Structures are given as C-alpha cells and as structure tokens.
Regions:
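Flexible, acidic loop-helix segments that line cofactor/substrate-binding pockets
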Residues: 118-125, 137-138, 142-145, 176-189, ...
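Short glycine/serine-rich loop segments
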Residues: 2-109
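Glycine-rich, small-residue loops and helix-cap segments
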Residues: 48, 165-168, 173, 195, ...
C-alpha cells in the first residue's frame, strides 16, 4: 500500500504533504517526523509489520525515533532505488521501519542486491555477523554532538544513561572530536537543493506532473503548472538549488560544498578507524505539536 509523506520527501514533520499532515499515534496533535512520517506511524500503530520510506537526510531515522520504531538507512547503493522519485540522487536511499532489529535484518537481507535498473546499486555481497552478546565493541562518542547547544536536554540525559549502561557491560567508550559539525547542515542543503532543482525540472506540465488548465501557450504552461502544482516548501528548495547552480554562484556555493562533503567523509572514515560504532542522537529535538515551527530554517535544523 501507499503511505503519506512530505511532498517529494522534503520536510521534517510530514506537514508538507499534499494530502494533509500525519498525526503521531503516540501523542495527539503532535507530528511524527518526516519526511516518511506515514511509514513510521503505520508500523508504530500496528497497521503493518514493516514499511519502507526514503531517507535523504534523516527522513527514515528521524520519524522512527519520534514514533518508537527502528529506522534504518542502509549504505548508499545497498538497496535499489529503482522506482523512487528522486529528490537528491547522491543522497537518496530506501530505508526500513520495523518493530525490532531482527525484522530490520530480515528485510535488508531480502531487499539488498544488485539491480540492473539501478546503476548505483552495489555489487558487494551482504554479510551478517552472528549475534554475540558477549562481544565487546569500541563505541565512539562525538564530543561536539553531545555538547551542542541545539541538543534537547532530555535527549542528552537519556544518551548519557545509555553510555553508562554500555560501560557497565564492558564496552569501550572512545571520545572523539568532529570539528566540522557546523558545516553539516549548510553543506547538505546546498547539495540537496541543487540536485532537487535538476531532478524536479521534468515536472513542467508537459513531460510529467500537474498541468494547469488555465495555461495558454508553452511558456505559460511551464510557469503556471509549476507555480500551482508544487507546494511552498518544494518551491523554496527548487529556488535555492537553482540559485546555487546559477552562473556566478556555482563555484562559490556548489563546488565548495562538494569539497566540504569530501572533507566530512574523510573525517568520518578516520573515526571508524578507531571505533566499531558511532553513538549519536537521531535528531536534536523531540516531537513537537503541529504548526509549532513556522521558520523553515528551524525546521531544517531538525535534519
């Protein structure tokens, strides 16, 4: 079946849906997170055992954390993206919602593999380790994440309790530093909006998508169809992406963001040389009431 989500997977609350917002089944009038909020609520409410969503920058993991389910974004290319309407092609990945880790493992084992219709799908064999509760892991804790002023105190407190429990069970806790944390969200939004601007250009009322019945002529068809057909958040991101790709700004924004992305990846790879697992909050804040956040920038910081 089909489930509700933010329009073109652009949102962190599922309030940008063309079909109306999804309500968090755990608390009335609260959002479930987004963009895959419908998928999260379907599993959390017991409407289905498992569900799928797309995760570009947290769109599975964030609503999972707000609905008490297990959300997983597999490694890029592990699951085929064939059939997915692209938001940002170099970030998008199909993810899963389940009620337990075992179901997530089973679902991944079924879905993973090469797909001739998706050139980005991985050819590497998927291997699972046998569960061993006696095995001890090196668990990395990023200082800048836990000390960040934007992290909700309730989340910080719960994570500290988890860390203490892990220590008592014999796992090694390793303190790490990620000095580039303030560059994560800006870099993400420069690159994803740029890719969205390109990917959604085909929805012009001629080739794909809504076509304005009032339009007269080709140019007016393009303008009216996109103006009337897209929601406000989608239009906002298309405009931002078009700006960073425009002449005179491409090198200043898009090219620089690609370089920063490489730095961020290299820094992450270095952390995994010292650790087996990184323990981090899924989202900086907890679920909020519908219509509580009006500022798009504040909403972007939920990613």
């Amino acid at each position: 079946g089909r489930l509700n989500c933010d329009e073109f997977a652009m949102g962190s609350s599922n309030e940008n849906s063309a079909f109306g917002p999804v309500e968090n089944n755990l608390k009335k009038n609260y959002v479930p997170g987004g963009s895959s909020g419908g998928s999260a609520v379907a599993v959390s409410a017991g409407l289905c055992t498992v569900s799928l969503g797309s995760d570009t920058g947290g769109s599975v993991r964030q609503p999972a954390s707000w609905t008490g389910t297990y959300g997983m974004k597999p490694t890029y290319g592990r699951i085929s993206r064939y059939g997915l309407i692209a938001y940002a092609s170099s970030f998008d990945q199909i993810g899963t919602f389940t009620n337990c880790v075992e179901d997530a493992q089973l679902l991944l084992s079924i879905m993973a593999g090469t797909d001739e219709f998706d050139a980005t799908s991985s050819t590497k064999e998927l291997k699972f380790e046998d569960a061993d509760s006696s095995k001890k892991y090196r668990i990395g804790i990023i200082k800048e994440c836990f000390d960040h002023s934007g992290l909700d105190e309730e989340i910080r407190s719960h994570l500290q309790k988890i860390i203490q429990d892990l220590k008592l069970k014999g796992h090694e806790i390793i303190d790490l530093s990620f000095p580039f944390i303030e560059y994560l969200v800006p870099t993400y939004y420069v690159l994803t909006t740029a890719e969205a601007s390109s990917n959604l250009s085909r929805f012009d009322g001629v080739h794909f998508g809504y076509r304005s019945p009032e339009a007269k002529g080709v140019e007016e068809t393009y303008i009216k169809s996109r103006t009337e057909g897209f929601g406000m958040e989608v239009k906002r991101r298309i405009m931002a992406g078009t700006f960073v790709l425009s002449q005179g700004y491409y090198d200043a924004y898009y090219s620089q963001a690609q370089k920063v992305r490489r730095v961020l990846k290299n820094q992450t790879d270095k952390m995994f040389e010292k650790t087996d697992i990184l323990l981090m909050p899924s989202t900086p804040g907890t679920a909020f009431e519908k219509n509580a956040i009006k500022d798009p920038i504040q909403m972007y910081l939920q990613d």
